[in-house]
Amino acid sequence: MPTINQLVRRPRRPRESANKAPALQHNPQKRAVCVKVYTTTPKKPNSALRKVARVRIAGYGSEVIAYIPGEGHNLQEHSVVLIRGGRVKDLPGVRYHIVRGALDAKGVQGRKKARSKYGVKRGV
């Protein structure tokens, strides 16, 4: 434990919180290119085939795994996508989401509710 004198000379510094989405480099979103599009299984107790893509971030070169939200998608290798932060709790290592309705990722077909989250225009 430091003495009062030591604390006067060098005060305590607050601990910096860890960056949850380091590959975005403090940007809200980044453009990326799909390297591999595949499905993976969640950890216990859940069971499904979750759609994910391994993407290479443009102008940065690092590869991360991003989740493809919604039912059905049109993504394949070399698709250009927009990624945002946000992890998927039951998929270890997936810390990014692909933004639907931006760049090559089309919006979810037939979506009626929560449309803004899935890139769907207001069908009149």
Curated annotation (Swiss-Prot):
Modified residues (3-methylthioaspartic acid): 90
A Pfam family reported for this protein in Swiss-Prot or TrEMBL: Ribosom_S12_S23
GO biological process annotation, one example: translation
Xref: PROSITE patterns: RIBOSOMAL_S12
CDD domains: Ribosomal_S12 (cd03368)
Gene3D superfamilies linked: Nucleic acid-binding proteins
Tagged with keyword RNA-binding: yes
Swiss-Prot/TrEMBL keywords: Methylation, Ribonucleoprotein, Ribosomal protein, RNA-binding, rRNA-binding, tRNA-binding
Complexes and interactors: Part of the 30S ribosomal subunit. Contacts proteins S8 and S17. May interact with IF1 in the 30S initiation complex.
Sequence similarity: Belongs to the universal ribosomal protein uS12 family.
HAMAP family reported in the protein's UniProt record: Ribosomal_uS12_B
Purpose of the protein: With S4 and S5 plays an important role in translational accuracy.
Protein name from the UniProt record: Small ribosomal subunit protein uS12
Source lineage: Bacteria, Pseudomonadati, Pseudomonadota, Alphaproteobacteria, Rickettsiales
